[in-house]
Design a protein with these regions (language model features):
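Catalytic core of tubulin tyrosine ligase-like
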Residues: 15-78, 82, 90-94, 102-245, ...
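Basic (Lys/Arg-enriched) interaction patch that binds polyanionic ligands
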Residues: 86
Length: 253
């Protein structure tokens, strides 16, 4: 409800908190009498949070409520279904379903570069919890990756390029966050991270994108190992907060 370009991340987290706090407003609630009361309770909760934390956000609550109400009226004109029942019935009838994840594996709340992650499961397992489909119903997992590495916002990035090559990748690859519009950080392909992602997702096929972005670069490098606590490792360490750096011998390929 109270989302704005300056505070979208804040309220996205509040939405996750509503869910895990078991007081969120769900689509199915719109078919029940009294959903407006639940909505008003949540609205007051978030307004109190803003006041308590003294957050400086410019918004018109009445305008936001009006926009929300108009959206609800449109949603209620649609047919509501139990999505997990619909999807499983489709599978039982021989239909094929393709699910698409919206975020990278390293943003996963459990297996990503915590705490620089999102608030949900972005790995293939998230398709099960998000859609209500059992793990044994998934036949193939397509791992889609870029020929180089990108990241939006803060967090560890061992192969990041803070030079003209990194800027070139961002410009040619049009690397801006899909939701926030923030420029993405760019760097060489990190095979350690890629291997980790393949493992935790159970990837069966790999698809590489944006190889053309690297056209014209005389020497293309990849990272195959990390220097970590004086040792050379080829896996993602437990904590991303501990210092890791690409091994020069293994990135110079």
């Amino acid at each position: 409800l109270l989302a704005s370009s300056a505070a979208s991340d804040v309220y996205k987290r509040q939405t996750y908190m509503d869910k895990t706090g078991r007081n969120g407003l769900r689509i199915g609630d719109l078919e029940l009498d009294g959903w407006e009361e639940k909505f008003n309770t949540l609205t007051n909760k978030h307004l109190n949070l803003i006041n308590n934390f003294n957050v400086d956000i410019d918004f018109d609550i009445n305008k936001l409520i009006e926009e929300f109400t108009n959206s609800i009226n449109f949603i209620k004109s649609l047919r509501f279904i139990d999505s997990e029942h619909y999807l499983n019935e489709s599978l039982n009838n021989g239909k094929k379903i393709l699910g698409e994840g919206a975020q990278g594996s390293l943003l996963d709340i459990d297996f990503g570069t915590y705490p620089y992650v999102t608030s949900s499961n972005t790995t293939a397992a998230g398709a099960c919890t998000g859609l209500g489909i059992a793990p044994n119903k998934i036949n193939n997992v397509f791992g889609i990756f870029k020929a180089y590495t990108t990241r939006v916002g803060s967090g560890p990035f061992p192969t990041e390029l803070k030079d003209e090559i990194g800027e070139r990748m961002a410009k040619i690859g049009n690397e801006f966050g899909a939701t926030t519009g923030r420029p993405r950080r760019c760097g060489w392909l990190d095979l350690v991270i890629l291997k980790h992602s393949i493992t935790v997702n159970g990837v069966t096929e790999l698809i590489m994108m944006k190889g053309d972005v690297l056209s014209g670069i005389d020497r293309i490098k990849v990272c195959t190992k990390y220097k970590y606590r004086g040792e050379t490792i080829d896996y993602l360490p437990y904590s991303c907060l501990l210092y890791t750096s690409p091994s020069p011998r293994d990135t110079d390929k």
